[in-house]
């Protein structure tokens, strides 16, 4: 799996325009293989066409949380869903809280301007 493919698996959900129910994160985190071996504590899904997300790599250049300079911030707010592991949940029964948001996203890009890491939303 390339970094770009991993980004697609972990963060892209073009089939839904928003999280359909409060159970969305529980289903999607499992379906996208983020509950194998451990519960990924936090993850964001983006409900926009791939072309829209790829285009962020040509938008505002910002510094990533880790200090690298290959992050880019979207010009507009995008439809995203934030999944946060609930305090009571323990592996292998990973449970998540689902939040629908409209926020600008910050992604790290590599090579031919392809998103490879979700850094933050603002």
From Swiss-Prot:
Protein name: Ribonuclease pancreatic
Gene Ontology terms: biological process: defense response to Gram-positive bacterium
Residues at the active site: 11, 117
Record-listed E.C. numbers: 4.6.1.18
Residues that hold substrate according to the record: 6, 9, 40-44, 65, 84
Complex and partners: Monomer. Interacts with and forms tight 1:1 complexes with RNH1. Dimerization of two such complexes may occur. Interaction with RNH1 inhibits this protein.
Gene Ontology MF terms in the entry: lyase activity; nucleic acid binding; ribonuclease A activity
Compositional bias per record (Basic and acidic residues), positions renumbered to this chain: 1-16
PROSITE patterns listed in its UniProt record: RNASE_PANCREATIC
UniProt subcellular location: Secreted
Main subcellular localisation: secreted
Origin species: Osphranter rufus (Red kangaroo)
Gene Ontology CC terms, in alphabetical order: extracellular region
Highest taxon, organism lineage: Eukaryota
Summary of the tissues where the protein is detected: Pancreas.
Start and end residues of each stretch annotated as Disordered: 1-20
Keywords in alphabetical order: Disulfide bond, Endonuclease, Hydrolase, Lyase, Nuclease, Secreted
Classification via SMART domains: RNAse_Pc (SM00092)
Described purpose of this protein according to its UniProt entry: Endonuclease that catalyzes the cleavage of RNA on the 3' side of pyrimidine nucleotides. Acts on single-stranded and double-stranded RNA.
Cystine bridges: 25-83, 39-94, 57-109, 64-71
UniProt keyword Transmembrane, yes or no: no
Similarity field: Belongs to the pancreatic ribonuclease family.
């Amino acid at each position: 799996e390339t970094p770009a493919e991993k980004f697609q698996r972990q963060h892209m959900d073009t089939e839904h325009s928003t999280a359909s129910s409060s159970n969305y994160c529980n289903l999607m985190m499992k379906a996208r293989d983020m509950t194998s071996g451990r519960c990924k504590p936090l993850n964001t899904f983006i409900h926009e066409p791939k072309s829209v997300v790829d285009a962020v790599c040509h938008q505002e250049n910002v510094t990533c949380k880790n200090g690298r300079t290959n992050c880019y911030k979207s010009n507009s707010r995008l439809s995203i869903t934030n999944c946060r592991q609930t305090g009571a949940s323990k592996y292998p029964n990973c449970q998540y809280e689902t939040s629908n948001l409209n926020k600008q996203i910050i992604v790290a890009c590599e090579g031919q301007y392809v998103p490879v890491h979700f850094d933050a939303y603002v």
